[in-house]
């Protein structure tokens, strides 16, 4: 039997206990849902099998909840909202402090669930948890963001503004960050006074189940945080439920544009981060060793399954000669099961993802690109049945090739050649995506030219994955975000998304009204 991190409580989620090896689980149990602070088995007859990506052994079955079960979660959140809203922000903050502490205490348990279900290396999975934890820590400072404004606008008259919660909100989360994305949503939504219905990815819900277990332990009342499961039917239910006032989504463009359109049509606020094709411009004056190390990590970490993975290089001038060295560095990466010591990257999420990635590599070959490093057909000796794609570098790519136009979402780096910085900027700006970009250079003037003219929402100067820390906000643009990027995640904009503004103007006159005639002209208070 696999080693267990913690004994399983009879009343707890299956997610409270996770192996730290990829050994076969002899008796997998079904994943429950979470309503009214309790784990409940679904009564559905429809389940989605979840397999360890390193072995394709069955880990659990995830239920497609019935409509009655979905409605129970929404009703729970709706019932909890008035009392939760009425709690002082300091009381909610104290619960958040406890929640942060519990996440830290259960860091390895959360990471183990991610490695088993999603495939990330254990070290990378710990980073997934940490980046979400940082948002939860920042949410503890919400009272500062929630402070309103006041102005004496005229004699005996003042105007005050308040930020108030929306009500029930929902989060639809992707497979690639099973802890981080739920933690982009739960802390900010709840500390501002909302209640939450969370749908983790059906491919790896375990981390979310641990997070709600910890939320209960931290002191969140019944109904404040609920978890539902399923695929399209669950998404549609959440989009249509009139009780839900806002939807948060991270994922691909097809799903995200659908969610934004249907959610908006139903009168909901929607924040939706979508796909990406993140470029880096490489200048001849850059620190070559720094560039080589940074790109190997940014392109191939998490098997390339990051919305901010640096998947495209724009080699300026002579830098194209460095790609041989880049391939040599990438060859040294250890591709293995995520629990194995020394593993640098694990498998991709499903056999279907592997097939799609390999087909895009093949298309590049057919269209005349060069496969400088080919990760197809790779199999670690210990795990021959996993969804393996090794690091792959494709050179001599042109922008009309399929491998360039599509988001590959795997450990594949495509490389294009240009002669000048201006050409690099033009090429990057012509791409329809705008999540992030980077430039590698020693020149401040070059960096400033790039910063000023580039059209991506998050820019790194010698930083390959410029995801902002939680005191800022995640600011993709163009087709990488729905709705023009108005509703962004975390930071002050995250607080704004989960709250609505109320403005109150009050007149407190010490003198009695002496006029006998009403004034029907537009009041100007001047």
Where would I find each of the regions flagged by the language model?
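Hydrophobic face of amphipathic alpha-helices that form TPR/SEL1-like repeat modules
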Residues: 5-54
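ALDH superfamily catalytic-core signature
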Residues: 254-398, 421-422, 427, 461, ...
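Short, well-ordered beta-strand elements within core beta-sheets of diverse protein domains
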Residues: 59-65, 80-86, 171, 280-283, ...
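Residue-level signal for inorganic ion chemistry
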Residues: 56, 92, 114, 136, ...
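Conserved C-terminal structural/oligomerization subdomain of aldehyde/semialdehyde dehydrogenase
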Residues: 3, 8, 57-61, 244, ...
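Structural signal for hydrophobic packing residues in well-ordered secondary-structure cores
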Residues: 81, 85, 100-107, 111, ...
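Glycine-rich loop-to-alpha-helix module at the N-terminal edge of alpha/beta enzyme cores
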Residues: 57-146, 156
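Rossmann-like NAD(P) dinucleotide-binding subdomain of oxidoreductase/dehydrogenase enzymes
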Residues: 148-290, 418
């Amino acid at each position: 039997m696999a080693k267990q991190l913690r004994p399983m409580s009879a009343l707890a989620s299956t997610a409270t206990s996770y192996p730290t090896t990829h050994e076969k689980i002899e008796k997998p149990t079904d994943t429950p849902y979470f309503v009214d602070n309790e784990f409940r088995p679904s009564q559905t007859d429809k389940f989605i099998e979840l397999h360890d990506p390193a072995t394709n052994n069955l880990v659990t079955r995830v239920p497609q909840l019935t409509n009655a079960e979905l409605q129970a979660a929404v009703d729970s959140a709706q019932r909890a909202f008035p009392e939760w809203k009425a709690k002082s922000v300091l009381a909610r903050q104290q619960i958040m402090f406890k929640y942060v502490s519990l996440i830290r205490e259960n860091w390895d348990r959360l990471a183990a669930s991610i490695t088993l279900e999603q495939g990330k290396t254990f070290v990378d999975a710990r980073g997934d948890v940490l980046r979400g934890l940082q948002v939860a820590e920042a949410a503890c400072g919400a009272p500062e963001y929630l402070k309103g404004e006041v102005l004496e606008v005229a004699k005996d008259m003042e105007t005050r503004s308040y930020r108030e919660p929306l009500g029930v909100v929902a989060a639809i989360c992707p497979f690639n960050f099973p802890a981080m994305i739920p933690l982009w949503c739960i802390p900010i939504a709840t500390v501002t006074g909302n209640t939450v219905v969370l749908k983790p990815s059906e491919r790896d819900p375990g981390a979310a189940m641990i997070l709600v277990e910890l939320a209960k332990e931290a002191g969140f009342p019944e109904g404040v945080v609920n978890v539902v499961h399923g695929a399209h039917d669950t998404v549609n239910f959440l989009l249509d439920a009139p009780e839900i006032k806002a939807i948060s989504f991270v994922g691909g463009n097809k799903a995200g544009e659908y969610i934004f359109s249907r959610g908006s049509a139903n009168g909901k606020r929607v924040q939706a981060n979508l796909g990406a094709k993140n470029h880096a411009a490489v200048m001849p004056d850059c620190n070559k060793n720094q560039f080589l190390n940074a790109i190997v990590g940014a392109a191939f970490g998490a098997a390339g399954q990051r919305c901010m993975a640096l998947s495209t290089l724009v080699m300026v001038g002579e830098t194209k000669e460095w790609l041989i060295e880049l391939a040599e560095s990438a060859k040294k990466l250890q591709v293995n099961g995520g629990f194995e010591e020394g593993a640098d990257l694990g498998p991709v999420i499903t056999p279907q993802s592997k097939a799609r990635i390999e087909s895009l590599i093949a298309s590049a070959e057919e269209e005349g690109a060069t496969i400088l490093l080919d990760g197809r057909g790779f199999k670690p000796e210990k795990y021959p049945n996993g969804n393996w794609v090794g690091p792959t570098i494709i050179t001599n790519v042109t922008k009309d090739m399929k491998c360039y136009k599509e988001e590959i979402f795997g450990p594949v780096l495509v490389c294009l050649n240009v002669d000048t910085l201006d050409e690099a900027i033009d090429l990057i700006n012509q791409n329809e995506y705008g999540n992030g970009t980077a430039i590698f250079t020693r020149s401040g003037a070059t960096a400033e030219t790039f910063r000023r003219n580039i059209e991506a929402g998050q820019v790194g100067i010698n930083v390959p994955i410029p995801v902002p820390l939680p005191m800022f906000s995640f600011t993709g643009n163009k087709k990488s975000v729905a709705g023009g990027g108005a509703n962004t995640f975390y930071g002050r904009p995250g607080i704004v998304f989960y709250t609505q503004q109320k403005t109150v103007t009050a007149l407190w006159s010490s003198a009695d009204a002496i006029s006998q005639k009403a004034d029907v002209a537009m009041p100007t208070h001047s």
